[in-house]
Amino acid sequence: MRRRSWVSGLLVLAGCGDAGGGVSTEASTEAAASSGGASGPGGESGAPPTTGGAPTSGSGEDGSSGSTGPAATPGPWEFGVFIPPEPQAPGDPVKGYEALVTRGYITCGIPWLLFGLAKPLLGPYTDGEALPGRSGKNAQVPYNWTVHEVDGAEIVSQNCLTCHAGSFNGQRIVGLGTADEDFTGDMSALLNTFPIPDIPIPGLEQMTRFLNRMKVLGPMTVMRTVGTNPAEAVAITLVAHRDRHTLAWSEEKLIDLPEMVVPSDPPPWWRAHKKNALFYNGMARGDHRGTMMLATALCTDSVAEAQQIDSYFADIQAFVRSVQAPKYPFAIDAGLAAQGEAVFVDNCAGCHGTYAANDVDDTYPNLLFPLDVIGTDAVVAEGGTKYAPALVDWYNESFYGSITRMEPNNPFPGYMAPPLDGVWATGPFLHNGSVPNIELVLDSTKRPKFWRRVDYDSAHFDQAGLGWPFAELMYGHADAEDAEKKFIYDTTQFAHTNTGHTFGDHLTPAERAAVLEYLKTL
């Protein structure tokens, strides 16, 4: 598989979903329904799913979720704080999938009449395969593009699948975060070469608006490493140029915010139906669709326009909450996996939950952990209080904040322990993508300071370590050749550290191998 251009994901804010489900692109809307149907895995549409009676803290008998391990064994779950569920707007997941891949929630882009001419200029990010099940002109564009009408003009815009339809074993999976996007360049430099014709073509107004936004975003969203996502920078930059009450765009910044390179690893959508708070730091509370809708902020220039998008976004959220993790496609040693389940229950389930043959019988404790317990890079957890409190204030006073609250300090800055369904497919790991495989998540002493992926072929998967094949390096960005720098993950850089989650360090190699085998069954 070719790496897709750094241009691609910036056309859609990565806020389009904190987590969700794994649906092969072979799925039609009927398949979307069968993955959870109108009821979804939590029961009645929009109802919070069962979490097995998670306790208000991570300790005590109620924290066992029906197993003997987590309750009987002291562990880090004792320090977790339960985040309670809140009602989600009801929606139709079948209609939601249709809206996700056909509606124009990004209202600026490239005129349909110019899209064919744009491909040679825009390169790899326009050569994705078509999305099965779409018809008409949408069957002629890549899976992460949508042809739609704005004010009578046909334009082509990117959709949420730009960041949320990764590849695994050669198969496109809707809901899997992308791990091969290249955001290491300033996209505005490329887009400045795009010729705008003098003749009147429907959609030129939307294209001009799109190009102007990219000039603002481009310099602020340059990442250091291929595969890391600039979701934090995109969100910060866009809201800094908007009036919080009217959503009107300003060419000048309205909020002074720090310029930081903060990497993010897009989480899978299949976690969404279990989580009571979205984002790695758990700051999105209430009905989650408000923060999901922030993905439309690229071109949403009025509250009326946001309300129109909101008219169908509950359906999109229902789809996100209905889909499920994919099944591990390779062989599994059943005996070793059974041994691993026992180790997992004693050492991991207190934070990450328990897993049954039926998703409805799973348990997930929804625990938020303080930084001094989890120990992972603190920048994202502290972003809303230390680095960008103005962003939180803007959001909570905006239209989006009337739907979803941002609470980065409730009750403290920290990180949620995520559900682990399909975790084997979601590398690299930790919230900033700093650890190449799960084996190293379970053994912090062996994590490389500098590393790079061997290649970007999704069919090349490390079945032993559960991650993408990588090479450890003896040097980082400071000593690398310019052409190689963007492929190196340098954990000495700000917000890129790979510390923390040392909870597997005490396991023996045999126990660790057994847990890895068990995770393949999830």
Predicted regions: what they are:
Residues 69-522:
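Periplasmic c-type cytochrome electron-transfer domains
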Residues 1-14:
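Sec-dependent bacterial lipoprotein signal peptides
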Residues 13-73:
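Ser/Thr-rich, Pro/Gly/Ala-heavy low-complexity intrinsically disordered linkers and tails
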